[in-house]
Amino acid sequence: MVEDADADRLAASLAGRLDAVTFTDLTTDQVTARLIDAVADWAGEQGWRVYRRAPSVLPLPPPMSARQSVLDVACARPDGPPVVVEVDHGTRRRTWEKLLAEADAGRVTLWVRWGAGRFTAPPPPIRMVSCAVHRRPDPTGVLHSRRPRADRLPPVHSAVPQGSVDAVELPLPPTVSPGAEG
């Protein structure tokens, strides 16, 4: 089985790479393709051999069980076990089965899960790399957009800079409205 520290390090590295991925108004298929490209680029930057649509160790279910499933990206590393990556918009049991079979074969398994909602964590030893994407309806379907994390600044809470403030002892005394007589 693959070392947890190696898998965690690779998941964090890929997450850092995906943080820089941006796009506007892409379809679901286009987003998946863009993320697969980013994963392949990340792996290539590591100096690894990169294979797209590589055969999985898991066969397809009947009636196509004579054929193999494919992985979105598989990587051969000179300094460690192979790395396999699946990129999905939804949570599919079949993806988990495929990645678990790959982990049993000694590979580091990374699952890039993208979308706008909550993500269900996969079973160990699969590492999830989440990628938050905004969606909006369009007459042609749903379109997705993403800004890098660095551009998503926290909201400004006050437009006027505040100077020093004086502490006030609680409870506050009742206030008298202007024009009201006491």
What annotation goes with each model-predicted range?
Residues 6-19:
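Hydrophobic face of amphipathic alpha-helices
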Residues 16, 20-32, 37, 41-79:
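Active-site metal-binding core of divalent-cation-utilizing nuclease and nuclease-like domains
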Residues 114-182:
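Domain-level recognition of nuclease-like catalytic cores that cleave nucleotide substrates
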Residues 57-59, 76-95, 116-119, 139-150:
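Short, surface-exposed, charge-dense and proline/glycine-enriched linear segments
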Residues 81-134:
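Catalytic cores of nucleic-acid endonucleases
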